[in-house]
């Protein structure tokens, strides 16, 4: 079957979803999670085939790798999504016009959502659970790196759908080639929305070539500013957590900005980073402050390319500033508008930072690692939107709906 026919089938299958009861949707999600638990070894075997084709030193390796613990977490996330309130048929507003006509603004599914992602097999289940719960069919375009894993996961989803009499095309996995990507991006009339999840180069490619509406997600160039009034204890813990908790995710710290007056505390703030072999690219003042305290093999002089880079690795840059205005200027120039944090004890500085930094998530005395749908209480997320239209920040169930107007009357005609 060619890709165009697969997309037509997904579009047709989406119409069946509208008629499903909430109880049916919840039951299918719970059953799918349970089947995943009983087929863990099958999925791990497929994942091992993918891992064998990738260098363990590749930053994508950690994202690609599935473990029994991670699969248990994926199943739990799906069960959690099943417990969330349905985002559909919510009356957003209701007005009665002078002529007696009633107008209701009601949430509805998009229809078919295409998601393009790289070496992240966990996204397969996250996308299906969120799309299915919100009444949308999903078209999955995973990367070739994760093809064995994705196919194993979709087989589990299809087995449950078929057993329940649901058209399995509501979860369609496209071939992992570039031609399929091109077909998806041009599928006007068959696909209602495309969400890319991955590197900045992937997102740029989708933005440049898509004819279908796109919500950009994923790329995170994240900064943390240690202010003149910052608590160094908080700074040490936050910087270490934001950088080393999981380097391959989009909310990981890429650049520490530090006020010049606090350079003497920089060795303490960076004290835990050598435990994870974090390579630091420091500007001249920061390099001088660290040179006798940080391992020589892990400390390098920064250049212009050190800033504005999403490392996705045990690497980070450090920039020294003399004022909040310099901080704001640096972030405005290099940020991907994902997650930015300030460590400060001065309420006015925090207020200005929160007000003037243009990002989806702006933190004060908190690690950027919390930019996550589950951590925000949304359940699993389909991605972190870095744009402003329709959705911004972690995208969960409400962001996967649009609305329509329902108008009722009693024979009214317009003069």
From Swiss-Prot:
Under catalytic activity, the entry for this protein gives:
L-glutamate 5-semialdehyde + phosphate + NADP(+) = L-glutamyl 5-phosphate + NADPH + H(+)
GO function terms (MF aspect):
glutamate-5-semialdehyde dehydrogenase activity; NADP binding
Keywords attached to this Swiss-Prot or TrEMBL record, sorted alphabetically, are:
Amino-acid biosynthesis, Cytoplasm, NADP, Oxidoreductase, Proline biosynthesis
- Where is the protein found, in the record's own terms? Cytoplasm
Q: Which GO terms describe its biological process?
A: L-proline biosynthetic process
Q: Which SUPFAM superfamilies match?
A: ALDH-like
Q: Which Gene3D superfamilies match?
A: Aldehyde Dehydrogenase, Chain A, domain 1 (3.40.605.10), Aldehyde Dehydrogenase, Chain A, domain 2 (3.40.309.10)
- Which Gene Ontology cellular component annotation is one that this UniProt entry carries? cytoplasm
Classify the source by domain of life. Bacteria
Give the EC number(s) listed in the UniProt record.
Answer: 1.2.1.41
Pathway annotation from the record: Amino-acid biosynthesis; L-proline biosynthesis; L-glutamate 5-semialdehyde from L-glutamate: step 2/2
Major location category of this protein: cytoplasm
Keyword Ribosomal protein appears in the UniProt entry: no
Q: Which InterPro entries match?
A: Ald_DH/histidinol_DH, Ald_DH_C, Ald_DH_N, Glu-5-SA_DH, GPR_dom
Reported function: Catalyzes the NADPH-dependent reduction of L-glutamate 5-phosphate into L-glutamate 5-semialdehyde and phosphate. The product spontaneously undergoes cyclization to form 1-pyrroline-5-carboxylate.
What family name appears in the similarity comment? Belongs to the gamma-glutamyl phosphate reductase family.
HAMAP family of this UniProt entry? Answer: ProA (MF_00412)
Name-wise, this protein is Gamma-glutamyl phosphate reductase
Species assigned in the record: Parabacteroides distasonis (strain ATCC 8503 / DSM 20701 / CIP 104284 / JCM 5825 / NCTC 11152)
